[in-house]
Amino acid sequence: EPSQFILTGSSVLPEADETIHSGTGRYAYIKMRPMSLYESGESNGKVSLADLFDDKPFETQTNDLTIDDITYLTCRGGWPWATLISKEVALDQAFDYVDSVVNKDIQRVDGVKRSPERAKLLLRSYARNISQQVPLSTIRKDMLANDSSTLDEDTVTDYIKALKKLFVIEDLEAWNPNLRSKAAIRTTDTRHFVDPSIGTASLGLGPKDLINDLKSFGFFFEDMVVRDLRVYAEALDGKLYHYRDSTGLECDTVLHRRNGSYALMEVKLGGKDLIDEG
């Protein structure tokens, strides 16, 4: 039917006084994310999250993707155009995106003048701490190591807020099940990008770099898994979180649905020992 969808840009929002109607009560908002591996055709989708919630049986699956394939997909990202072009050109898309964010969008998003160099430093710090629960103070210290000028946490917070408005950064909040437990919930967010290719591009990394540093690759791989799980979670009326308490009990991702059901998921790159640990 006509007028079912209104498609808009996402990087720079209009000024409040230019908005005629907020859309409340008239529009339903859909967050458009980078493509999941299922949407881009690299995942076979044989295991359904919806079926797992319904306790339906499933068979153990194997994936034909090699580790070289996965490092490439991590660096390529889920950008639609990148899925349609040659591999060499596809890897450039994330680098072009990061350049545009730090040199243009970071200032256009709300009209506040910001330093492209500091924006780069923040993205690099986030990439070094990807998929980890690090406080703002740690990110600030990491940035200060490469920034000779003064830098307070308020400034770091301002840049992070701007990057969240631009849909570049999307941290994973802590899940509190509200159970009667004496263990205190650790509330520090897990640091994530909306797409892992933003992190690899920020550090100037390619697929071979990840192959040569499998430990770092594991963190970027988790970032990619979180990207995909967020897509699937929203389709199930759910939201993704992480869990960690004062006793050391932790879980990489918690998919909590509006009906109260939830799933706990641990992310491992592969290998029997790591899978058994998970």
PLM regions: where:
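Short glycine-/polar-rich loops that comprise or flank the Walker A/P-loop
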Residues: 2-3, 24-28, 260-262
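Accessory nucleic acid-recognition modules appended to NTPase machines
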Residues: 83, 87-261
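Short, intrinsically disordered, charge-balanced linker/junction segments flanking boundaries
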Residues: 1, 271-278
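Active-site ExK catalytic segment of metal-dependent nucleases
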Residues: 263-272
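Sensor-1/coupling segment of RecA-like P-loop NTPase cores
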Residues: 2-19, 163
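Short conserved micro-motifs at the rims of enzyme active sites and ligand-binding pockets
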Residues: 203-205, 266, 276-277
